[in-house]
């Protein structure tokens, strides 16, 4: 595992499983830089995202998902937006 600089994380809304629109106004295709724009992301979604982001940042992987990627849903059952977190390494 590379113990150097931590990768950047990009979070993108990729789908919606619930019947209602997002209360925070997020739409499919919205994308955020975790380091500079995380304050724009719904707190409920961030609560779900943080463990995935932490694992990606430190080189972990998830069963059934590509390396450097984590897909998860927000915890609002009425909305259930699907998010994709991606590890972005500087060249």
Region locations from a protein language model:
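Short, compact, well-ordered microdomains
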Residues: 59-91
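Short, charged beta-turn/beta-strand-edge "cap" motif at the junction between a beta-strand
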Residues: 36-42
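Short, compositionally biased
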Residues: 43-60
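Short, structured beta-strand/loop micro-motifs enriched in basic residues and often containing a Trp
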Residues: 8-18
């Amino acid at each position: 595992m590379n113990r150097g600089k931590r990768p950047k994380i990009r979070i993108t809304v990729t789908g919606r499983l619930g019947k209602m629109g997002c209360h925070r106004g997020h739409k499919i295709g919205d994308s955020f830089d975790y380091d500079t724009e995380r304050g724009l992301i719904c707190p409920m979604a961030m609560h779900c995202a943080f463990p995935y982001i932490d694992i990606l940042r430190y080189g972990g992987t998830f069963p059934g998902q590509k390396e450097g990627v984590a897909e998860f849903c927000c915890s609002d059952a009425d909305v259930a937006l699907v998010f994709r977190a991606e590890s972005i390494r500087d060249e």
